[in-house]
UniProtKB/Swiss-Prot annotation:
It is found in: Cytoplasm. GO terms for cellular component: cytoplasm; plasma membrane. The keyword ATP-binding applies. Gene3D superfamilies: 1.10.1750.10, 1.10.8.60, 3.30.300.180, P-loop containing nucleotide triphosphate hydrolases. It holds the Pfam family Bac_DnaA_C. The keyword Plastid does not apply. Residues 361-482 are annotated as: Domain IV, binds dsDNA. One of its GO terms (biological process) is DNA replication initiation. Keywords: ATP-binding, Cytoplasm, DNA replication, DNA-binding, Lipid-binding, Nucleotide-binding. Residues 96-143 are annotated as: Domain II. This is Chromosomal replication initiator protein DnaA.
Length: 482
């Protein structure tokens, strides 16, 4: 057996021996990854295991590196035993597993204690692979979760890595770490996607789990209804029975003193019971105006995970994944063109992709950059649209008649279509508010103003409304060019 030559206290390993050790390490880690991939759920494997790197193995000690301390701590706490057991099965004997942080390995300390702390494996953690069906799923608090908002469809980048990892962490082990989890970021950056992905994941593991996903507005409306019906006890029992509660747009609780009061006690009850709380906002707790100090304190006591706008590479990956899932094949130059021009949020980015495909389909043109560039970079001046053209397009979209739009029907679908028509006429014509009112059967200018404000707000807060308005605009754009 060849031995390394000792020079100045350092053992020099022959080149051939070093290659053999490296190949042995690589082969071992590949086998471990292959087995863990079948044991763990896909989001768990890709977030915690696949991102780790095997650094060294001397036959007794396997050293791994993770991309950040967050991932290292999670592996140490929940998956150390699992990895060590799989390695022992492959090798036929037990090993010691040590985990460090990849960014630290460039400068190894004098003592390995800080970088590679000796870790005693924690008690065995049962690895649960989520079942493939969710039969018997209980109804959610407000409405069914969006089936597209799952972890496998979330594109991870530098802008959202921490938020994604934290969301998966609490989906795996709710109520243990990061409680509450406070997701913070601008409109359309993926907060709602992550919240609903948590709900999907928990329901796959436990179909009987009580998962509540509500907006702050829904919570407030339920509270008001309970006060009117004198049923506050039922309201409290309902919300405090949640296993996981996720509240979107929590910033809208500002200034609502009684809602804040009730949410404070609901929060305390759930937190003390070890139930998971997830909140989402467009700003951190300390920047929400007219928010009680005790709520700022509660909201900040867990983990605040910030989400930033995606970089170019992440935007390209988002578009590629969406086109793949939606079966909308796009040329690479089209994807890069969209990614370069829509930089603020994911909602606009995906909307541009949908708009490009819809435009090509409606116009009958090939999906090339030359053909779709006009709709992706629309002219700054208003489209040449007549009131009749807008009325006709809105009527067809909402499956109502122009007479309905000009009439006084209060049916929900007619009222909404009428409000959308007024909004679009304000956007795309030079008509005054009274003149727009005349186009809709002589409606008062205050009615037009209210409709424009309401649809404008819905466009920002309701993704479905934003998508519907964009589709109508696409049709109007094509019509204006005809």
């Amino acid at each position: 057996m060849r031995r390394g030559k000792k020079v100045g206290g350092i053992v020099l390993i022959p080149y051939s021996a070093a290659i053999a050790v490296e190949q042995s390490l690589e082969h071992l880690w590949e086998q471990i990854l292959e087995r863990l991939q079948h044991q763990l759920s896909r989001p768990t494997f890709e977030t915690w295991i696949k991102t780790a790197t095997a650094e060294a193995f001397d036959g007794k000690v396997l050293r791994l590196s993770t991309p950040n301390p967050f991932a290292r701590n999670w592996l140490q706490k929940y998956y150390l035993r699992t990895i060590a057991d799989v390695a022992a099965e492959i090798l036929g004997h037990g090993i010691e597993l040590q985990i460090g942080v990849l960014s630290d390995t460039s400068a190894e300390p004098e003592s390995g204690a800080e970088l590679w702390p000796a870790i005693s494996p924690p008690p065995a953690v049962e690895v649960v692979k989520p079942p493939t069906t969710t039969a018997g799923r209980p109804p959610l608090r407000s409405s069914d979760l969006n089936p597209k908002y799952v972890f496998s469809r979330f594109v991870v980048g530098a802008n959202n890595r921490m938020a994604h990892a934290a969301s998966l962490a609490i989906a795996e082990y709710p109520g243990r770490e990061y409680n509450p989890l406070f997701l913070c970021g601008g409109v359309g950056l993926g907060k709602t996607h992550l919240m609903q992905a948590i709900g999907h994941y928990r329901l796959e593991i436990d179909p009987d789990a009580k998962i509540f996903y509500v907006s702050t507005e829904q919570f407030t409306n339920d509270l008001i209804a309970a006060i009117r019906r004198d049923s506050m006890q039922s309201f409290r029992e309902h919300y405090r029975a949640a296993d996981v509660i996720m509240v979107d747009d929590i910033q809208f609780i500002e200034g609502k003193e009684y809602t804040q009061e009730e949410f404070f006690y609901t929060f305390n009850s759930l937190h003390e019971a070890g139930k998971q709380i997830v909140l989402a906002s467009d700003r951190p707790p300390s920047q929400i105006p007219r928010l009680q100090e005790r709520l700022i304190s509660r909201f900040s006591m867990g983990l605040i995970a910030d989400i930033q706008p995606p970089d170019f590479e992440t935007r390209v990956a988002i578009l590629q994944k969406k086109s793949e899932f939606e079966n909308m094949p796009l040329p690479r130059d089209v994807i890069e063109y969209i990614a370069a021009r829509y930089t603020s949020n994911i909602r606009e980015l995906e909307g541009a992709l949908t708009r490009a495909v819809a435009y090509a389909s409606i116009s009958g043109l090939a999906l090339t950059l030359a053909n779709i560039a006009p709709v992706l970079t629309p002219p700054t001046e208003k489209m040449e649209l007549s009131p009749e053209m807008i009325l006709q397009t809105v009527a067809e979209t909402f499956d109502v008649s122009i007479e309905d739009l000009r009439g006084n029907s209060r049916r929900r679908e007619v009222s909404l279509a009428r409000q959308v028509g007024m909004y679009l006429m304000r956007q795309h014509t030079d008509l005054s508010l009274p003149k727009i009112g005349e186009q809709f059967g002589g409606k008062d200018h205050t009615t037009v103003m209210y409709s424009c404000e309401k649809i404008g707000q819905l466009r920002q807060s309701d993704p479905q409304m934003g998508k519907q308005l964009q589709e109508i605009n696409d049709q109007l754009f094509v019509a204006s060019r005809g």
